[in-house]
Amino acid sequence: MKPTRPFHQTPVITIDGPTASGKGTVAALVAAELGFHLLDSGALYRLAALASVRYDIAADDAEALAKLVGELHITFREGIAQLDGADVSTDIRAEEIGNRASAIAIHAPVRAALVARQRAFRKQPGLVADGRDMGTVIFPDAALKVFLTASVEARATRRHKQLIQKGFSANMDDLLRDLRERDERDSQRAAAPLKPAADAQLLDTSALSVDQAVEQVVQWYRALVPQS
């Protein structure tokens, strides 16, 4: 596999894919394998939402929200989201925080501040960025762009296992229906539709273990950047 674009001094690997394709897990493990920084862009929006609640900033105060986004101390380590040094991985998954994230993201100043924060994660020795628009808008010059795919059945099985392990009840038929509906919404929406970048590598993980998927991504990257 040959490089198709000039490399930035600090390399980026972007990973996208549909819900329950394993992109978050794969991104975290690839970052750990290569010693790269990690960015979970979806979690970043939720972190901003959580902070706005904690600092009592109104969801319609665009200027104050944008200022807050620029000042937050945020880190991602092995899939753990930290805000001001505290693990808030569970807190940001609350439904009300998800709704708040959608509410604040409609403001152009907030989106601009979040884009700047995402790009600021690009530091030596490199970055693995997980999320929509990473390879098309945020890091169009990424060294490697990966789009994970998997059958809806495989993804539902994974999601079912995750929920059971966390102590939640789960129905496979409901999960299958929810994933199909989510895929349709994501692929047809006007803003950031679910589709791979034109120069992305497609990786079907239906029959792959997490370790196998990680190994393939790392192999692709090292083929492009042999000294890595």
From Swiss-Prot:
Q: Which reaction does it catalyse?
A: CMP + ATP = CDP + ADP; dCMP + ATP = dCDP + ADP
Q: GO CC terms for this protein?
A: cytosol
One matching Pfam family, short form? Cytidylate_kin
Class in the EC hierarchy, top level: transferase
Cross-referenced SUPFAM superfamilies, in alphabetical order? P-loop containing nucleoside triphosphate hydrolases
Record key words, sorted: ATP-binding, Cytoplasm, Kinase, Nucleotide-binding, Transferase
Family annotation (Gene3D superfamilies): P-loop containing nucleotide triphosphate hydrolases
Tell me where on the tree of life, at the top rank, the source sits: Bacteria
> InterPro entries, alphabetically?
Cytidylate_kin, Cytidylate_kinase_dom, P-loop_NTPase
Q: Where in the cell is it found?
A: Cytoplasm
Q: Which GO terms describe its molecular function?
A: ATP binding; CMP kinase activity; dCMP kinase activity
Binding-site residues for ATP, renumbered to this chain:
G17, P18, T19, A20, S21, G22, K23, G24, T25
Instruction: Assign the protein's first listed, main location to one coarse class.
Output: cytoplasm
Write out the similarity annotation: Belongs to the cytidylate kinase family. Type 1 subfamily.
Q: What is this protein called?
A: Cytidylate kinase
Report the source organism: Paraburkholderia phymatum (strain DSM 17167 / CIP 108236 / LMG 21445 / STM815) (Burkholderia phymatum)
